[in-house]
A protein has these predicted regions:
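Enzyme catalytic cores with a strong preference for nitrogen-chemistry domains
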Residues: 1-230
Length: 230
């Protein structure tokens, strides 16, 4: 989900000179890459990693919701007998992360907590984080899957609704998609359209500290309305 293709946490240091030239110790970097863990079996995770400008790893999040047939092959032992295989990661399946975590930064330079979401994890309504104890949602994505279809636009639209539901701003970085800053009311503050490269800066983002009505009750609201209607 990032610009450094086929790069893992272990070999990220080869970009140290490039990063040091363009960033200072006042910067942190969020990079989408693969993390490979070796043990009894090799596990590969679609990851969002947070680094300082020396490319020292600060924290990492493993994607929880994987794309069937894209990132993993369901019923692999059975379906592989028919020649089916997933289409990414050199035909290896990604492993599933098991924690929807908040990344917290709390020092003299950086005081921020954010909820990392990778790719289409942003489309899930009411499943983001039970405690809602974060300042901003950061979503990275590779939308090249969709080509010239309506897909990247639909994917982006989901981000707007998540911002409204949670009362949190969303910072979205999407290769071959729409990158944007969305405020806690779902308004698009800044935007880079498809196939446009660039950057934008921001400060003093507002967000709702308390849980919103939706983040308290989630999609149970709609079941309640259905019961009333019946």
């Amino acid at each position: 989900e990032g610009v450094l293709t086929s790069t893992s946490v272990k070999d990220i240091k080869k970009y140290e000179s490039l990063i040091n030239t363009n960033f200072s110790d006042n910067h942190l970097l969020i990079i989408g890459l693969n993390d490979v863990l070796s043990g009894n079996e090799i596990k590969i995770y679609n990851s969002l990693a947070l680094f300082n400008n020396n490319l020292d790893l600060i924290d990492i999040y493993y994607k929880n919701n994987l794309v069937p047939f894209g990132e993993f092959l369901p019923f692999k032992n059975f379906l592989s007998n028919f020649g089916l295989k997933n289409i990414t990661n050199n035909y290896y399946s990604f492993s599933k992360g098991n924690e929807r975590k908040v990344i917290n930064l709390n020092d003299k330079k950086f005081n921020l907590s954010f909820l990392p979401l990778i790719c289409y994890e942003i489309i899930y309504s009411g499943r983001l984080k039970k405690n809602n104890n974060f300042d901003i949602i950061i979503n990275i994505s590779e939308d090249g899957w969709f080509g010239n279809s309506i897909g990247p636009h639909q994917h982006f639209t989901h981000s707007i609704f998540r911002a409204i539901e949670e009362g949190k701003p969303i910072l979205r970085s999407a290769n071959n998609g729409i990158s944007a800053l969305i405020d806690h009311n779902g308004r698009i503050v800044k935007k880079l359209d498809i196939r446009n490269s660039g950057s934008f800066s921001f400060e003093n983002l507002r967000y709702i500290k308390e849980k919103t009505f939706f983040s308290k009750y989630g999609n149970n609201i709609f079941f309640f309305l259905i019961v009333i209607y019946i």
